[in-house]
Design a protein with these regions (language model features):
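Charge-dense, helix-prone N-terminal extensions
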Residues: 1-131
């Protein structure tokens, strides 16, 4: 995946590589999800548990027409947007039901992002678990 990310302009590339590292680190701390698959979906770097029905796909990319922004995209038909907004509506910029918007010039809020990544990667597991 680094060979894909290396094609981005330097500031955006660095921000996306940092976000990729955060996803990989978070996944490594979640033994219940098993191995993480790193692939391309719609031309964007994408991350999801290899085993089915564990979590939902996360994608990362720059923002079209916005050279200083990038995003963590999640499945728009999931309840993740509502969940992220409930937990971190004041700490994160959540666009609709599909993305968390980040700026390449600012330090991202790591703990809220890490938690949102974990929520996505365990999405189906959590739906099946008793409350």
């Amino acid at each position: 995946m680094e060979s894909v990310l290396i094609r981005y302009p330097a500031p955006l590339r660095d921000a996306l590589l940092d976000l990729r590292a955060l996803i990989l680190e978070t996944a490594a701390d979640l033994p219940e999800i098993g191995e993480l698959r790193e692939t391309l979906k719609w031309g964007q770097p994408a991350y999801l548990p290899k085993r089915p029905r564990i979590g939902t796909t996360l994608r990362i990319d720059g923002l079209r027409g916005e050279p200083t922004g990038h995003a963590l995209f999640f499945h728009c038909q999931s309840s993740l947007g509502q969940e992220f907004r409930r937990h971190y509506g004041d700490a994160l910029t959540i666009l609709g039901d599909r993305s968390i918007i980040l700026g390449i010039q600012e330090e991202p809020p790591l703990e809220p992002l890490r938690h949102c990544i974990a929520l996505a990667l365990t999405y189906h597991l959590r739906k099946r678990s008793p409350a």
